[in-house]
Amino acid sequence: MKKLTKTNAHRQQKLASIINEVLIEILRRGKMLDIRLFNCPLAITKVIVTADLKIANCYFLPFNTKLTIDDIMDALNNSKNAIRNFVTNKINMKFSPEIRFHYDHGFDNAIKVEKLLKNISLKRRDKDK
């Protein structure tokens, strides 16, 4: 495994930023995508590139859609090669990273934490009465 240096970390961040921009552009235009994604607004929440620059883990969050997370994952994975080719054309590197999509559980986790905190607060209020 490649050692993480300051220069390499900068390259990771730069590549992640470029991939994020390209994904947003592709999703906005709807080019080269599985037909199920046309009426499925997605937010790319983050892109994390591995130290060796070979894998880009892309996290998404769907908005107001009838599709399940599994359907969205399947549609994104069907579009993966076209997306990778588009990324390759936008970056100036010998190799384009493999793109992997993941559902971003951060929003769901934040809602759960908020509910837990609210329950604790209510229990404290009830105890104080």
From Swiss-Prot:
PANTHER family: RIBOSOME-BINDING FACTOR A, CHLOROPLASTIC-RELATED. InterPro entries: KH_dom-like_a/b (IPR015946), RbfA (IPR000238), RbfA_dom_sf (IPR023799), Ribosome-bd_factorA_CS (IPR020053). GO terms for cellular component: cytosol. It comes from Rickettsia canadensis (strain McKiel). Disulfide bonds: none annotated. This is Ribosome-binding factor A. SUPFAM superfamilies: Ribosome-binding factor A, RbfA (SSF89919). Its main location: cytoplasm. One of several proteins that assist in the late maturation steps of the functional core of the 30S ribosomal subunit. Associates with free 30S ribosomal subunits (but not with 30S subunits that are part of 70S ribosomes or polysomes). Required for efficient processing of 16S rRNA. May interact with the 5'-terminal helix region of 16S rRNA. Belongs to the RbfA family. Monomer. Binds 30S ribosomal subunits, but not 50S ribosomal subunits or 70S ribosomes. The keyword tRNA-binding does not apply. GO terms for molecular function: ribosomal small subunit binding. GO terms for biological process: maturation of SSU-rRNA. It is found in: Cytoplasm. Keywords: Cytoplasm, Ribosome biogenesis. Gene3D superfamilies: 3.30.300.20. It comes from the Bacteria.
